[in-house]
Amino acid sequence: MLTPEKISDLVSDAVASIPYPAEPARLYQPIAYTLESGGKRLRPMLAVATCSALGGEVSKVIDAATGIEVYHNFTLLHDDVMDRADLRRGQLTVHKRWDDNTAILSGDAMLTLATMMIAKAPAEVMPEVLDLFNKTAMEIYEGQQMDMDFENRNDVTVKEYMEMIRLKTSVLLGCACRTGAIIAGASQQTAQAFYDYGVNLGLAFQLRDDWLDTYGDPLVFGKQIGGDIINGKKTWLLINAMTELRQELCDILAEDLDDEERVSQVRAVYDRLKLDERCHSLIADYARRAVSAIDAVELDDDARQYFTSLAVKSIDRTH
């Protein structure tokens, strides 16, 4: 299997090498701006790593892997418009630097570009890869709609929330892994095992994001701590607190408090309920499920270590 450094370099080079026409600049500059802003590149690395681990030719997966990354960033462009977010990865969001219409149209172009790149998968598997991508994209839109619907509800259950983050976040990681497996020529059973790995890893990552938003170090996390509380965002932490201490939490959220005091009081409720430790335990559980999903797959030691390490890092990552 390729080394982690080689996988990272391949993905970074592929994203940096996407050719953009010079005109119209207002369409393409925001795309370059978004893709040059960094990010973990987790999804394309999963596609490349899975293909490599299963003995596939990495050159055959790199276009699809890059397309998945372009698609992921398209969803962020539109999410930022819907959420009215000002910052993404420490810089102005596209709709703030340009305007809403630019963010929408550049996002549309990214969706088409992503589909074109994914369609470059080897001809013998291209229909399967494209079907998987389209199914995944529809699930992501369903998850985003659920997230928006939750904004107007105070009775969201943990089960509903977990289904929402599975759709909105996790299935794209599963798609990336399965795409790599398909292009490597793996069996359906192996492809499904890696899909399950990606979905469980995605759940661990999203739950850790929830945790970091409340308990992280702002200098390391790169975002304002307590943003989810301030914005009334439904997270695993808030939903559990609402289930157990609804009236007290509703009183705090309704009270005329400054942001710092509101975050402090809500976090105190979380602490009393030991939601910090309970969330951490659940993250570790999903990380274990990810590793267990590929237990039966024949992998060399380096490959198994790569995927195990990714899962373990999801438990205690700081950003």
Task: Annotate each language-model stretch with its function.
Residues 1-19:
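N-terminal amphipathic/basic leader segments beginning at the initiator methionine
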Residues 6, 20-250, 312:
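Mg2+-dependent prenyl diphosphate-binding active-site environment of isoprenoid biosynthetic enzymes
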Residues 11-14, 204, 290-293, 310, ...:
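Amphipathic alpha-helices that form helix-helix packing interfaces
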Residues 12, 16, 111, 174, ...:
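An amphipathic alpha-helix signature
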Residues 238, 290, 307:
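Hydrophobic, well-ordered secondary-structure elements that form the walls
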Residues 245-297:
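Mobile late-domain/C-terminal helix-loop "cap" segments
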Residues 286, 300-319:
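Short, amphipathic C-terminal "tail helix"
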